[in-house]
Amino acid sequence: TVQLAITGIGSLDEHDSSFLRAGLITRADLAVLRGLGAVGETAGRFFDATGQTAGIEINRRVIGVELEDLRRIPKVIAVARGLTKVPAILGALRGGYLNVLATDNITARAILSLASKAVESH
C-alpha cells in the first residue's frame, strides 16, 4: 500500500494555471470550472472551496488517483506557494487531501487569514 504521496496544488487563475499552460484544459473549461465553484486542483482533480468535487464533471476525464484515495494515504505532502493559490490550498486542506504543506511564509499567512475570515462569517 502507498504510505507517502507528494503532490502540488494548482489554482484556477488564468495566469497561474499549469493545466491551462500545458493545454490540458481550455479557457472555456476554466470558465466552466469557476462557474461550478471550483477553486483549485490536486492530483489532477478539481475541487471547490470546501474541498468537494461533486458536480465537477471535468474530473471524469482524469485517469489517476481519486481524491478519496488520497485521503487514505498516511502522509500526503503538498507543495504550493503564491497568493493566487491560497483559495486552492485552503480548499485542499478542508477536503483533507494533505497533511503536510510545504509553502512560504507569505502564502501561509494568507491561508490563515482567509481561513479566519471564513470562520468569522459563519
What role is predicted for each listed range?
Residues T1-H122:
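Conserved phosphate- and dinucleotide-binding cores of soluble alpha/beta proteins
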